[in-house]
């Protein structure tokens, strides 16, 4: 047995006891110590590791892109610590994590741990192997391993700080991490290891037995049968909280077609928990290569499982809420099985989401592909970049369905597809503005014309005057001025009689001239009989009367300022 203090053993037991309280995420423990004092941490895997089992210790190198322990809350009262990578996606998106392997151990048949050495390199390592070896020696200086497989430092130093991880090889379990910090010892501090070394767990993590646990898994890839039915059969285990005698949950199937040009299919896990986030509604990148918030068009089926008791899903009462007819899909007998007919074999990413109380409790995905290559699915734990500066242009989502070329494997918003999409948005805005301008101009023109016509009609009604017929063939009466006396009226009557006699004689004489050859004596006698009655004075008065009448008519016309109409 390697040398260890009694306090170290007691703390190792404390750490082992602490591991009985686990969370459904990457387990992270916070370890702090004093500079120059002994430090011990680890899960004591020798006690639980079967014979022949192997596990390894790693150190996540300090880097701007390295993941950092962060408290994450998925619901009220359900918070845990997990590793969160840097938000600087532009620099860290395609950068591998620098992980340094410290030790690789195996358990023999006799129950002892044997160090089979740190590996010279790992597939996850980036950098020169010689540089990494020097770094390993510097970090492991003063580091030892206990019989239980824990890490110990005889005198902790600042160089020993970092994020240490341990994982059992081949078990499928995730890493258990220890976030180690070393504080500087103050003067007069004589605290021992038992009081200095401690493990802090977030106080608001709900114990595992007091909340729901959902486990969902299925193969990452399915090859579609050309002339048959493809069955998607995930494994789902639900362990409800102890205070739930009965519970309801829903499971939803989504099918997101992917573009054949995509080198990778990027699925943003954060959008499953925050579907209304603006960046998830309109993530940057080509629509066929990026999955943010899944829409109703992507929904294939939704089933409500009511009045479930315990973990036996056969006690639930299924209620199909939604099932899509195209593509041809149907629910299988087992929950949550999905059957996809051959007619619906479109290369797609099928996603299963399980919700309890409208909160996402678990999810899984698989690729349904035809024979041949398929894009590599990348699960991104970050929030996506929004297409616009404000993000979430939900009203223009239909414009994304253009025929623009995809941005292959890109997580940025400046690819060819986004440039064409922005050009389409700008063109649509210009056309809308021009249409509104033209319609507004036409409306103003019609309104002005209507007003002008209305004003003109009112002016014509108010200024219309009666017209005089000055071009008739015969006057029926002549206007007489108001200054004429009664005596003149009597004289006018006499003159009128004389004028009538004169007019008759003139007509007879004009007609008789044509017959002068037949009756010359008769025409001569008539002229002699009427001649003495028409004196020169009568002719003078008649001429004066005609002139007065004409002057009166002209005066009235000028006074009224009315232009007579002409009728023929």
Curated annotation (Swiss-Prot):
Signal sequence region: 1-20
Protein topology in the membrane: Single-pass type I membrane protein; Single-pass membrane protein
Residues listed as glycosylation sites in the UniProt record: 88, 179, 248
Disulfides per UniProt: 271-280
Annotated segments matching region Disordered: 470-534
Post-translational modification: Phosphorylated on serines within the acidic cluster. Phosphorylation determines whether endocytosed viral gE traffics to the trans-Golgi network or recycles to the cell membrane.
Pfam families: Herpes_gE, Herpes_gE_N
Intravirion side: 444-568
Subcellular location(s) per record: Virion membrane; Host cell membrane; Host cell junction; Host Golgi apparatus membrane
Gene Ontology CC: host cell endosome membrane; host cell Golgi membrane; host cell junction; membrane; viral envelope; virion membrane
InterPro entries per UniProt: Herpes_gE_N (IPR046463), Herpes_glycopE_Fc (IPR003404), Ig-like_dom_sf (IPR036179), Ig-like_fold (IPR013783)
Compositional bias per record (Acidic residues), positions renumbered to this chain: 486-500
Coiled coil, from the record: none
Chain ranges passing through the membrane: 423-443
Keyword Glycoprotein attributed: yes
Residue ranges, Virion surface side: 21-422
Chief location category: virion
Biological processes per GO annotation: endocytosis involved in viral entry into host cell
Positions of region (Acidic): 482-497
Keywords: Disulfide bond, Glycoprotein, Host cell junction, Host cell membrane, Host endosome, Host Golgi apparatus, Host membrane, Membrane, Signal, Transmembrane, Transmembrane helix, Viral envelope protein, Viral penetration into host cytoplasm, Virion, Virus endocytosis by host, Virus entry into host cell
Residues spanned by motif Internalization motif: 465-468
Subunit structure: Interacts with gI.
Family: Belongs to the alphaherpesvirinae glycoprotein E family.
Function: In epithelial cells, the heterodimer gE/gI is required for the cell-to-cell spread of the virus, by sorting nascent virions to cell junctions. Once the virus reaches the cell junctions, virus particles can spread to adjacent cells extremely rapidly through interactions with cellular receptors that accumulate at these junctions. Implicated in basolateral spread in polarized cells. In neuronal cells, gE/gI is essential for the anterograde spread of the infection throughout the host nervous system.
Protein name as it appears in the record: Envelope glycoprotein E
The gene coding this protein: US8
